[in-house]
Amino acid sequence: MDIREMDLKRQEANALFKKQMIDEALEIYKTSFLEATKSVVPGTRNDLLEEQLSLLAYNISVVYYKRKNFPKSLAFGLESLKHRKSDKVLCKICAIYLRLGMLREYKEMYDQMVTRSSGPEVAFLLKRMKLSEVIVEKHLEKRVTLESLHELSKEISGGRSIPADTLESILEQGESILLGCENVVHTESSGEVLIFGDTHGQYFDVVSILNKVFDKDRMVIFNGDYVDRGSHSVENFALLLSLKILFPGRVHLTRGNHELSDINRVYGFYDEVKRKYPFSSDSVYRRFQDAFRALPISIIVNEKVFITHGGLPEAPVKVDNLQEIYRMTDTHTDELLKGLLWSDPEEILGTEESKRRAGVVFGADVTARFLERNGLDLLVRSHQAVDDGYRVHHGGKVVTIFSAPEYEGSKGPGSYLVLNPSAGEADEIVEISPLTRYKAVKFGRSDGKEVLRLLCN
């Protein structure tokens, strides 16, 4: 493919992009970029070819930005800069840094651009970005620290609400980090991994158990449904999001069905926000929804354990398909997303209609097919209040974990799951494969006044 053909292909893709035919445009951009890289001759530089490589990489970056896949957008933005310096690309990378919560990188690049001699277009972009630069300065000053989180915990224990400006800062910082996650987060751990299910606003119970089990050698995963029903939903999600900000590689959060606005507006969370923030409830509630929409859908641990809030969709699916879901939504139009957030396992074959009117009831054969197709050993999900906070389905291939003790007046405990337990009686530990072992641990209610006391680094 010569330079002229590359340019024509790129213009064809641009036309498709303008018509909102995003998938078709991306395919042409990527194919053309790959062909262009084959034309590079080592040890020589062709300025026209470098220009096409830069433009194509930038176009790909823009598509991924539009899809809110900011890590890939950043990768292709930086690739574009390798081939040609461009103020427009620098501005785009600034915007990506901001969305990813990479505030210092944003500030450094913004300062560089201010000192560059730029044309009127870039001057206009910089003027628009000035507000973001002010926000970044504010967040660098109000960045969450372990010390500030401890102090906030003391205030909550004393019966006081989180100040609205502090809460909105936590939500903005957390959203930026969550936006940097793919739909399905792949993570590795050689140590224990603790998985918690629904916590439903039971903030003090969460603080109590974290004080006992959270340390520098353990990864912690919370599997959705942080809000509604309990009386401290605001504090519960703010705490867990703060831990995600502080320990982004060790704390992971997924989205549950109660992180959908049409659910949490009805089941208590919206009323809690109005009660605690009467003068800024709309703004605070909107900030929460922005953060909820940014939550990843699923997590895979050590390429063997698949964690998602609800269960499996009706149609056969591979993990790669899940990465293409548009998750920044509150609608129920995507069948894959509905299945992941709403479905439940039963001892049946195939699938049946769910009484929830969303997702399906799925059987052991559906589980086996999904695990086999994706090279997985175990599905961990939440979504249902079960006896003892823990239930095994489908011959041990599916585990439900529920972490709200004495939920809605019941007497049952909460539980969390320990992957790769380092200790435990032989009859406590379930071995799915040589690489996948787990045990469930029960816990009860706190005294309702717990203060966070994390001593890890």
UniProtKB/Swiss-Prot annotation:
<feature type="binding site">
    <location>
        <position position="200"/>
    </location>
    <ligand>
        <name>Mn(2+) 1</name>
    </ligand>
</feature>
<feature type="binding site">
    <location>
        <position position="198"/>
    </location>
    <ligand>
        <name>Mn(2+) 1</name>
    </ligand>
</feature>
<feature type="binding site">
    <location>
        <position position="309"/>
    </location>
    <ligand>
        <name>Mn(2+) 2</name>
    </ligand>
</feature>
<keyword id="KW-0378">Hydrolase</keyword>
<feature type="binding site">
    <location>
        <position position="225"/>
    </location>
    <ligand>
        <name>Mn(2+) 2</name>
    </ligand>
</feature>
<keyword id="KW-0479">Metal-binding</keyword>
<keyword id="KW-0904">Protein phosphatase</keyword>
<feature type="binding site">
    <location>
        <position position="257"/>
    </location>
    <ligand>
        <name>Mn(2+) 2</name>
    </ligand>
</feature>
<protein>
    <recommendedName>
        <fullName>Probable serine/threonine-protein phosphatase ECU05_0440</fullName>
        <ecNumber>3.1.3.16</ecNumber>
    </recommendedName>
</protein>
<feature type="active site" description="Proton donor">
    <location>
        <position position="258"/>
    </location>
</feature>
<dbReference type="InterPro" id="IPR051134">
    <property type="entry name" value="PPP_phosphatase"/>
</dbReference>
<dbReference type="Pfam" id="PF00149">
    <property type="entry name" value="Metallophos"/>
</dbReference>
<keyword id="KW-0464">Manganese</keyword>
<dbReference type="GO" id="GO:0046872">
    <property type="term" value="F:metal ion binding"/>
</dbReference>
<dbReference type="InterPro" id="IPR006186">
    <property type="entry name" value="Ser/Thr-sp_prot-phosphatase"/>
</dbReference>
<comment type="similarity">
    <text>Belongs to the PPP phosphatase family. PP-1 subfamily.</text>
</comment>
<dbReference type="InterPro" id="IPR011990">
    <property type="entry name" value="TPR-like_helical_dom_sf"/>
</dbReference>
<feature type="binding site">
    <location>
        <position position="225"/>
    </location>
    <ligand>
        <name>Mn(2+) 1</name>
    </ligand>
</feature>
<dbReference type="InterPro" id="IPR004843">
    <property type="entry name" value="Calcineurin-like_PHP_ApaH"/>
</dbReference>
<dbReference type="InterPro" id="IPR029052">
    <property type="entry name" value="Metallo-depent_PP-like"/>
</dbReference>
<dbReference type="GO" id="GO:0004722">
    <property type="term" value="F:protein serine/threonine phosphatase activity"/>
</dbReference>
<feature type="binding site">
    <location>
        <position position="383"/>
    </location>
    <ligand>
        <name>Mn(2+) 2</name>
    </ligand>
</feature>
